[in-house]
Amino acid sequence: LRDTDTQLRTLREMKQAGRIRYVGITTSFDKQYGEFEQTMKKETLDFIQVDYALDNRDAGDRLIPLAGDRGMAVMINLPFGRGRLFNAVQGKKLPEWATEFDCVSWAQFFLKYIVSHPAVTCAVPGMARPEYVSDNLGAARGRLPDAATRKRMEQFIDSV
């Protein structure tokens, strides 16, 4: 979020010239959310990219709904909370009720929470090994959690 006016002007010129297709902004820092939100309200953007995870839901309170209301695509980075979520559940079994939304791993549990948000377009998880790619793709298969199940997932992760 540095010199946003100049950067967005440049990006719009590039879009108009056909050099890029989409214009958006990104942040991974809660302390920038206020300025980020103001930019979202003031500017016409194609997308935003923000950090959002089952244990870090701040962007889901204001930024993600605002993007949905304004017709902006929403890309989620850090859906595993910089590894915090895996650390929190290390040695724990997946809840039995995770089968209700076709979930067979913790990575899928975390990603299905993210992509089931009605305003989220996609998640961008980091993957260090090929088997992680396969597992993460499993989150795109089968049922997604509904609103009540999403709340249950939040309560579960808040309790660990």
Region locations from a protein language model:
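Glycine/proline-rich, positively charged
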Residues: 1-49, 53-54, 58, 62, ...
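Structured C-terminal cap/extension of enzyme domains
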Residues: 42-47, 61-160
